[in-house]
Swiss-Prot record:
Function: Specific class of high-redox-potential 4Fe-4S ferredoxins. Functions in anaerobic electron transport in most purple and in some other photosynthetic bacteria and in at least one genus (Paracoccus) of halophilic, denitrifying bacteria.
Example GO molecular function: 4 iron, 4 sulfur cluster binding
Oligomeric form and interacting partners: Homodimer.
Protein name according to UniProt: High-potential iron-sulfur protein
UniProt keyword list: 4Fe-4S, Electron transport, Iron, Iron-sulfur, Metal-binding, Transport
GO-annotated biological processes: aerobic electron transport chain
Amino acid sequence: EAPANAVAANDPTAVALKYNADATKSDRLAAARPGLPPAEQHCANCQFHLDDVAGATEEWHGCSLFPGKLINVDGWCASWTLKAG
């Protein structure tokens, strides 16, 4: 179950970035983001992903694009960029 401060599907930023808490339900192929094949792109391997934020759980972490909110580590958005390292 999503925490209270999870990014909502109707959040304006989420809509603009085509965020989906389940990457398999997003159109990763159409976005053509470089770095990894679309099927391997998800929030946990994105440079904007933040591990250490208030309220984070194993499944829900922070994202610098959604301050104060949590994203699903298995999610995806159109700003996905491969994490360095």
